[in-house]
Amino acid sequence: MKKFAALLLAGAMAFSMMACGSSSDKKAGDKSSDSKKTESAKSTSASDIKVGVIYIGDENEGYTEAHMKGIQEMKKELGLSDDQIIEKTLIPEDETCYDAAVDLAEQGCNIIFGTSFGHESYLLQAAAEYPDVQFCHATGYQAASSGLDNMHNYFTAVYESRYVSGVVAGLKLNEMIENGDIKEDQTKIGYVGAYPYAEVKSGYTAFFLGVRSVCPSATMKVIYTNSWASIDLEKEAAESLIADGCVLISQHADTTGASTACEKAGVPIVGYNVSMIATAPTQALTSASIDWGPYYTYAVKS
């Protein structure tokens, strides 16, 4: 049981940060690059920093809540004031994102973050028009090929915590077998995915590998909602998986819809982004979570 508790804690806390990748990455020994970075750091004092953030959602869904906590941690670490940070919530993956980015640049932001996969093309457009503003995009991949020195991508190695949370799930399945709750051939897991994108697929692959590392008989079924955050669709997907015989649920989707369904059905849940204990107090095992604070602090300091 102590081992199980330790893995629960590890699953909740494990994360690994990746540096913001520029489209013009320089070698470590490139003195001209180091010089430019030093000059840039000197030219922007803390009082001159103005940060813009474009969120896909708001504080009511876990993914955006995690980013908001990271921004607040950065603000505290760097001693920034409220008027040095401008946050825009509920910005969809369309032209609205470009308009939001332009507005932030016009308000004097010298670094702008966009948090959703579908924001990337609109941030690229804005970055080309505002070369003196740094644009950083979460979960994207086009910065390196864009030819823009002020466009960057960032994400974490969250597959690592997904693997560990999969181990937690596998141990729970073993416990259910030992207790006689299920048989070995009933170790079927359901996974609520947002979109059939590489990010989601790599995540559930890591999770499933973690499960199978301790429970080799486990199988898994995935249902996509085709939405990053829809409490109703995620709840319906979880209910469908449970009805199909899944005895444990996990997710790569941003709301508490799945955990609500699991609590009602008495089915264990491994969440994402934030703790699911509030909505599944008897069924939440752990969540694959990300602490964005260190990255946001690093990026703004840079």
Where are the predicted features?
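C-terminal motif of bacterial Sec signal peptides marking the signal peptidase cleavage site
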Residues: 16-19
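Bacterial signal peptide processing site
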Residues: 21-24
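A residue-level marker of the well-folded mature domains of exported/periplasmic proteins
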Residues: 26-302
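Positively charged n-region of N-terminal signal peptides that target proteins for export
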Residues: 1-11
